[in-house]
Amino acid sequence: MKRTLIVVDVQNDFCEGGSLAVAGGADVAFGIAEVLKRWTDGEPWDRRYDYVVATRDHHIDPGGHFSDHPDYVDSWPPHCVAGTDGVAFHPNLDPQPFDAVFDKGEYQAAYSGFEGKSHDGVPLADWLRGHEVGSVDVVGIATDHCVRATALDAAHNGLETTVLLDLTAGVAMETTAAALEAMRAVGVRLQGEPIVR
């Protein structure tokens, strides 16, 4: 059984200074980069992961997902718009040794990385199956939105799923606590504590 690290939405617009910033996002990007450095520098026989993939919000025209008067539940300020700097991975996330990147939300709201497709059109679930992945660790932004949705979908797809909470940032205490409970309820393993400021 192969193991994969899924890096969720560590993008400029979700880090400090971005249009939908999550406090602690830049620190999470740096922490994930440290894991990626150890992975790329490690001996092939001593690597913790067989693959590392990333997801990105990549909005072209997501309809009602964007609003000038967002409710921050179903509608949000414009963010991660294709062709802008906001869609790029945060500079603290270096290196970026991704085996594949899965873009989501081009024309509709999308939270889970499992709603994304690689540049050659392969959905994340199919990519993982094709690479014989049975176990995933999930990290990224935000604990209470896209990390939660990705972890839940990973579990629903039969993957042994762990969220490395020290490498996640949540929007708010209340929604992060609810996300942790939802993930526990479907058997997702939780390690560490999320950043929530």
What are these regions (language model features)?
Residues 107, 142-145, 168-170:
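Short Gly/Pro-enriched loop/turn and capping motifs at secondary-structure junctions
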Residues 125-138, 151-172:
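Long, low-complexity, intrinsically disordered polar/charged segments
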Residues 46, 83-84, 88-141:
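Internal catalytic-core helix/loop-beta-alpha segment
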Residues 19, 76-77, 111-112, 137-138, ...:
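Short, contiguous strand/loop micro-motifs
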